[in-house]
From Swiss-Prot:
Gene that specifies this protein: NDEL1
Cellular location(s): Cytoplasm, Cytoskeleton; Cytoplasm, Cytoskeleton, Microtubule organizing center, Centrosome; Cytoplasm, Cytoskeleton, Spindle
InterPro entries hit by this protein: NUDE (IPR033494), NUDE_dom (IPR006964)
Coiled-coil ranges per UniProt: 25-190
Name the UniProt record assigns to this protein: Nuclear distribution protein nudE-like 1
Organism: Gallus gallus
Region (Disordered): 184-204, 322-343
One annotated GO biological process: cell migration
Main location: cytoplasm
A Pfam family recorded for this sequence: NUDE_C
């Protein structure tokens, strides 16, 4: 109203009409505002009642939620205490189980170690048993061979007596043959001076053949075995009527040399046999004592590893091949026509 300008009136009627119209206008506006206010008040009362009802519901819900919150807090505290108690018990149980596991592992390692030691000891005992069995079998075999060899040497001792007689006779015949050969050589020297050149050459060839035959070491095995024991008719004594041929003289000398070598070989073998019999008796007594001690020590729990090699492996059996005098590297070679004597 202040902003509206009051018009100028020409007459009082116009001014009265203007103010009447304006009052009616304001009155209508007042009526409309009153109606709106009544409607607003009614709506606000309804809204207030509704809000109060909602507030009551909200307060009730809030109280319920607070009660639930308190209950949940109590449950949380209870569960927390239970969890801590359960965690402490679980920690103690885990600690006990870890201790039991460590002890069980230690016991398991000890048992594995003990099993390995038992297996190793069992293997060592089995190896010692096999070595002992093999050594005993080898010793029995060599003992049987030695017994057979002793029997064979005893038979050769019997043959030696007859051979000595034959050798002595052949020595006498060889001495006579050498004397006769010396006489023949002197006769050939005399005849060589008076004979022509061609007979001289023949005599020289004959002398060289005789000297070569005398320097021969031994006859072959076949010839030696065939002519080892000649009959008295094959070798005369040098004083008979029929002279010996050069080939007969050479074969007789070779037979004598072979017999002398055989006699020497038999003497060396007899000495070796005596030494072997002495060593065998000493070894037999030592082996029996060692076998009894090894059988008594086999009842123990363990064998040290170096002790598993028995006496038979080192000295008792190999002594036949290495340490026995007369039977090892210094064994004489067998004479032609005779069997070798070896264990």
């Amino acid at each position: 109203m202040d902003s509206e300008e009051i018009p100028t009136f020409s007459s009082p009627k116009e001014e009265t009409a203007y103010w009447k119209e304006l009052s009616l206008k304001y009155k209508q506006s007042f009526q409309e505002a009153r109606e709106e206010l009544a409607e607003f008040q009614e709506g606000s009362r309804e809204l207030e009642a509704e809000l109060e009802a909602q507030l009551v519901q909200a307060e009730q819900r809030n109280r319920d939620l607070q009660a639930d919150n308190q209950r949940l807090k109590y449950e949380v505290e209870t569960l927390k205490e239970k969890l801590e108690h359960q965690y402490a018990q679980s920690y103690k149980q885990v600690s006990l189980l870890e201790d039991d596991l460590s002890q069980t592992r230690a016991i398991k390692d000890q048992l594995h170690k003990y099993v390995r030691e038992l297996e190793q000891a069992n293997d060592d005992l089995e190896r010692a048993k096999r070595a002992t069995i093999v050594s005993l079998e080898d010793f029995e075999q060599r003992l049987n061979q030695a017994i057979e060899r002793n029997a064979f040497l005893e038979s050769e001792l019997d043959d030696k007596e007859s051979l000595l007689v034959s050798v002595q006779r052949l020595k006498d015949e060889a001495r006579d043959l050498r004397q006769e050969l010396a006489v023949r050589e002197r006769q050939q020297e005399v005849t060589r001076k008076s004979a022509p050149s061609s007979p001289t050459l023949d005599c020289e060839k004959m002398d060289s053949a005789v000297q070569a035959s005398l320097s021969l070491p031994a006859t072959p095995v076949g010839k030696g075995s065939e002519n080892s024991f000649p009959s008295p008719k094959a070798i005369p004594n040098g004083f008979g009527t029929s002279p010996l041929t050069p080939s007969a003289r050479i074969s007789a000398l070779n037979i004598v040399g072979d017999l002398l070598r055989k006699v020497g070989a038999l003497e060396s073998k007899l000495a070796a046999c005596r030494n072997f019999a002495k060593d065998q008796a000493s070894r037999k007594s030592y082996i029996s004592g060692n076998a009894n001690s090894s059988m008594m020590s086999s009842n123990g729990t363990k064998y040290p590893h170096p002790g598993h090699t028995s006496f038979f492996d080192k000295g008792a059996v190999n002594g036949f091949d290495q340490g026995t005098p007369g039977l090892g590297a210094s064994r004489p070679s067998s004479a032609p026509g005779m069997l070798p004597l070896s264990v």
